Amino acid sequence: MREHKNFWDRNAGLYDCFMRKDRAVYEKMYELIRPVVKDKTVLEVATGTGLIAKHIVKAAAHIEATDASPEMIAEAKRGNYSAKLRFSVQDMFSLPYASKSFDVVIVSNALHIVPQPEKSLRESKRVLKDDGVLIAPTFTHAENSFPGKIKAFFMNLAGFPLHSKWTSEEYLKFLQQNDWTVRKSVVLKASFPLTYTECENREC
């Protein structure tokens, strides 16, 4: 896990530049997220530099945006942002929040890069209200185009921590196997296929 955090600490200053090419796709994703978080209390884990949180915060009541990388959070705190948004360094596997604290939990582009994604899902479920919504967009690398495969190859050489290479169908099945009901899914065409999902707690 320390190596994982080191990768993001080293690349925090480059992250926004890297993501810029997918700006149009991310705008579509923000449009999908805003109605879900409207007037809601939101937790985002693996916020990175806060791209998603900053673009949806006007719709939300409040957002706690967290990341394991101190350097990513330092980047996120640069510039002006809404008073409804708070950034902090937290462990997505052991969050400090009380159970059933949030209306919405966002885990964006993180489940494929951690060694135990099911553990993160359990912790997300713990802090989510019974009638809450999990938003979990994830790059599904098994469906990469040829240029995407080349890009992923060089990212791997640079130390990018890819642990799960799902197809969109495999990813949805993974969520269902971890007791989530997928109420909405859309595959967006970014540098890599991005499977956007909204889920509800099947156990409730």
Question: Which sequence ranges carry the predicted segments?
Answer:
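A short SAM/SAH-binding and catalytic strip from SAM-dependent methyltransferases
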Residues: 104-116
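Core SAM-dependent methyltransferase catalytic element
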Residues: 178-180, 184-204
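A short acidic, Gly/Pro-enriched loop at the edge of an enzyme's catalytic core
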Residues: 93-104
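Conserved class I S-adenosyl-L-methionine
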Residues: 1-37, 51, 55, 75, 135-158, ...
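Class I SAM-dependent methyltransferase SAM/SAH-binding core
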Residues: 43-94
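Short alpha-helix
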Residues: 163-178
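A short glycine-rich, Lys/Arg-flanked "PGG" loop and its adjoining helix->strand segment in the class I
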Residues: 118-130
